[in-house]
C-alpha cells in the first residue's frame, strides 16, 4: 500500500524526513516503554523501519513477543503536523550483515562531527536487528497547538495482511548486564526542573501503546502530574511510562486526576552507558566488554558470523539524504543552538 499517495502531503513528508521518532513497545507485563529511535521508512511508507542493537535487543524481543507498537513524530519547524502511528511490527534478524549494511546506508549521516574512521569501529552499535512496522492507524493534528481538537485519522483496510517476524532463535536469550538504575526522584527533579520534553506512553483500548508529548509535568510526593492534550483519544489510565530523551524512563500506573493525569512512579529503568555517558563510538573498556560479549552470544544463537563494517562510509540512501538535509537546515538556521541562560 502506497501511503505516500494516500496521506496528506505534510503528513507523508514528516514521516519521510524525520530522523528520530518516539518508538513504544510493550514489555512482558504489558507496560509500554518508549525509546527515541532513528527512523528510516520505505519510500512509499508501506513500512516504517526502526532498529535496535543486537548487543541490546530488548526492544526487538518485546516486539517479537507482542507486535503491537506505537510511534510519535513531533515537528521541528512551523507548519509541520504532529503524527501518531500504531502498527504491527515484524522483527528481522535472519541476516545481521545485511541489516547492518542497510542501517549504515540509512543512518550513518548522524553525528557528522565524528570521523568515519572512529565510527566504523563501533560494531557493538552497527550490528542491528531491524524492526519493520506496518501502520494500522495514523492520527495527525495540524500543529501542536491543534491537539485539543480531535485528530484526523487514517485506518488500514480490514483485509490488510500484516507480515510476521522472523522466527526467534531456538536457544534462550541472553541476559542484559546490570546497568545503573537511578533514584527516580533525583532524576525527576533534574528533568522537570529543566523543562525537558517529556513523552508519555500508555495503552489504548485495543492494546496498542500510544505516545503523546506532555504539555506540563509537575513533581509530586510519589509521582508526576501531567497535562495532556484534550484531543488525545483513548483511555488515560493503566500501566504507563514517561521518558526524557530515552535516558530517564519512569515506570508506573496512570490515573486521571482533576483534569490532569497522575503517574504513580514505581521505578526508573536502568540507563545504558552509551546514553548516560554520551559515548557510543568509543566507550570505556568496562562498558564495551559486556556489549561485545552479548553481541558474540547473540550472533552464536543465530549461527551467524561477526558482521564486517566497510572501510569506506557507505553511500547514503535517498531517504537518508532528505533526513540529513532537514537536520542541517535546523542547524543552519540556528534552531538547535543552546539558549542563553
Regions found by a protein language model. Give the residues of each.
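Binding-site signature for planar aromatic cofactors or substrates
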Residues: 1-341
